[in-house]
Regions:
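Extracellular receptor-binding modules and their adjoining Ser/Thr/Gly/Asp/Asn-rich linkers
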Residues: 30-45, 130-145, 164
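Glycine-rich, flexible loop motifs
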Residues: 50-83, 93
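Acidic, glycine/polar-enriched metal-coordinating patches/loops
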Residues: 2-9, 77-154
């Protein structure tokens, strides 16, 4: 049986009897993927677009499968002169993230936002200095990026310190 790859992160499932004497390399690579899922990465943005790859569209053996989009917590850095649209690829890869927009202004017209997209579906805009928890549905060309905390249902909320609600600080 030939090796196959998981659809989420391209983790290689070694076929029965394959890779005799070499399976350790594949296993270590798979462990590197799992480590990224539980880790943090700062990603420097520049210009007005960036592609954040979750996994290769057609994964193969080797470290070329390791992608920045495998990290679940990503801090966007870099000096922007305009809003930056980050495309999460491929559009068939479902994923979730915690993002921070820690970019700076390269001129005097900012601060600038990071716009997250995966397909023609919904997009999310993260304002400068803000964080978001999002998920990508991986629905192909119509894929959407969704704010996981929109319409948040909370039974009881306790706030210590100031709270800003609809622009009013209490």
């Amino acid at each position: 049986m030939a090796s196959t790859f998981t659809t989420g992160f391209g983790i290689e499932k070694i076929g029965s009897g394959e890779q005799s004497g070499a399976w350790g390399t594949t296993t270590n690579h798979n462990l590197d993927i799992l480590d990224r899922i539980a880790s943090y990465k700062a990603v420097a943005l520049s210009g007005s677009t960036h592609t954040l790859t979750v996994r290769e569209a057609s994964p193969g053996s080797g470290t070329e499968n390791l992608q920045d989009g495998m990290y679940r917590v990503i801090k966007f850095t870099g000096a922007l002169g305009a809003n930056n649209t980050v495309t999460i690829a491929p559009n068939t890869a479902p994923a979730y993230f915690i993002f921070e927009n820690a970019t700076t202004d390269s001129g005097s017209s900012g601060p600038y936002s990071v716009i997250l997209t995966q397909g023609s579906g919904a997009n999310i805009t993260i304002q400068n200095g803000k964080n978001a928890i999002v998920y990508c549905d991986g629905a192909g060309s119509g894929a959407a990026v969704v704010n996981a905390l929109s319409d948040l249902q909370i039974a009881t909320l306790e706030v210590t310190g100031a709270a800003t609600i609809d622009g009013v600080t209490t």
